[in-house]
UniProtKB/Swiss-Prot annotation:
Coarse class of the protein's main subcellular location: membrane
Taxonomic classification: Archaea, Methanobacteriati, Methanobacteriota, Stenosarchaea group, Halobacteria
Protein name: Halorhodopsin
Family: Belongs to the archaeal/bacterial/fungal opsin family.
Organism: Haloarcula marismortui (strain ATCC 43049 / DSM 3752 / JCM 8966 / VKM B-1809)
Compartments in which it is found: Membrane
Cellular component annotations (GO), alphabetically ordered: membrane
Modified residues (Pyrrolidone carboxylic acid): Q21
UniProt function note: Light-driven chloride pump.
Length: 276
């Protein structure tokens, strides 16, 4: 190992130690992380039990998609708790905390990048939508999360932080269009409109809270502390992920016959073969 790499490793370890100490000394921040880890563990066990008797391919796919939500969350929140995906950022000129080092739990964006597509996959399967529409929703969602991460990490320009925030919101609008305009008709045709409508409203209302928290928190205008913002995100995660997934799985387990027949390639296991 070269001297340069040894120095870099030492600095990284020191930084992680400082970050971990800061997390543990901030009760609101620390508790918001560990409560989510504990809940994710319980939810994983619950979802395993709820999905063990599912038989149809489409129902199983919905179950796998919803299972991945707490699995991703517990992994990501463990990264936050260890300080691995948290860092100090010096805010640029023009920011409310310009020149100050602010603790940034940027690992949350990893959680959202991998978990929110699973939420959309589950909703798309429930609505029995077509693959093109599902692909659109998921890719727009990933774009939203990645540009949100860029907005949070940029320290060179206050303006660019808000530019990327605006781009992220534009991706979000595309996701909302799919959820509110395209998929309801698909769900109506699939016979799942009632539960889809409930989950759609739950998802849209809660997801709107994320950009609002970003704007009000230390990443935006800094009206909220890091700990308060973290609890806001954790609360939204609990409702938008675990409660959402529980409601969906409970309905699927009780109405598997409704989702057993599907016209979508993914949900039905492929197109109907042609007659010989």
């Amino acid at each position: 190992m070269t001297a340069a790499s040894t120095t870099a490793t030492t600095v990284l370890q020191a930084t992680q130690s400082d970050v971990l100490q800061e997390i543990q000394s901030n009760f609101l921040l620390n508790s918001s992380i560990w409560v989510n880890i504990a809940l994710a563990g319980v939810v994983i066990l619950l979802f395993v039990a709820m999905g063990r008797d599912l038989e149809s391919p489409r129902a199983k796919l919905i179950w796998v998609a919803t299972m991945l939500v707490p699995l991703v969350s517990i992994s990501s929140y463990a990264g936050l708790a260890s300080g691995l995906t948290v860092g100090f950022l010096q805010m640029p000129p023009g920011h409310a905390l310009a020149g100050q080092e602010v603790l940034s739990p940027w690992g949350r964006y990893l959680t959202w990048t991998f978990s929110t597509p699973m939420i959309l996959l589950a909703l798309g399967l429930l609505a029995d939508t077509d693959i093109a529409s599902l692909f659109t929703a998921i890719t727009m969602d990933i774009g939203m999360c990645v540009t949100g991460l860029a907005a949070a990490l940029i320290t060179s320009s206050h303006l660019l932080r808000w530019v990327f925030y605006g781009i992220s919101c534009a991706f979000f609008v595309a996701v909302l269009y799919v959820l509110l305009v395209q998929w309801p008709a698909d769900a109506e045709a699939a016979g799942t409109s009632e539960i889809f409508g409930t989950l759609k409203i739950l998802t849209v209302v809660l997801w709107l809270g994320y950009p609002i928290l970003w704007a009000l928190g230390s990443e935006g205008v800094a009206l909220l502390s890091v700990g308060v913002t973290s609890w806001g995100y954790s609360g939204l995660d609990i409702l938008a992920k675990y409660v959402f997934a529980f409601l969906l799985l409970r309905w699927v387990a009780a109405n598997e016959g409704t989702v057993s027949g599907s016209g979508m390639g993914i949900g039905s296991g492929g197109a109907t073969p042609a007659d010989d």
